[in-house]
Every structure is written in C-alpha cells, then in structure tokens.
Amino acid sequence: MEVDRAARKRAREVLIVLTNVLPVPFPVRLRWRKLEGFGESLVSTKKDGTRSATIDLRLGMDPDLCSEVVCHEYAHILAWDYQGRNHDAVWGIAYAEVYKYVSGDH
C-alpha cells in the first residue's frame, strides 16, 4: 500500500510540473485503473466544445515507472491535435520536451 501511495504522489507531482511548464488548453486528470498495459491517454470533447484529457495509470506501479508513464502519456496529449495516438515524429519531439523537464535536463 505504501508503494501505491508513493506512486500516486509522484504521478501528481509530475503532472503538476508538466501542466505548468508545457500547458495544454484544457484540464488533465489522472485516473487509476486495472489495465493490461501501463497507461493510456484520451483527449475528449463534449458537445459544447469543452475539452479535457485523462491519463489512466495501471494500479500497482512503482513511483519511477509512474513517472515514466505520465511523461509518455502527457506527450500523447501534447501531440494529440497533430497525429492522435501515434508514436510518430511529432510525439517524439513532445516526449523529448516532457522528459527534459521531468528529468531535470533543462
């Protein structure tokens, strides 16, 4: 249980950093679920045009893995309007920027 608490804390901290240094024009929330993979992201638009994003994270991950997964999924959110969910060049550039701020190499 202590690992789960630490992982949730780390994920929140990483998301706070990312939304401050690489903001998107809509709210991003974290959600913990039973997943086969490590994480998933989704940007959705309501009928009124309001957008939001959700990063789903697998229950039971350690804090370091949570940090990596939040970075990976946040890069998808940054690149969403360009290519959707693909791991292409746009996503790669977004991931490099995200990782730079989280790893401290900026």
Predicted regions and their residues:
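Active-site-proximal or metal-binding-adjacent scaffold patches in catalytic folds
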Residues: 1-68, 77-106
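Walker B catalytic acidic pair
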Residues: 73
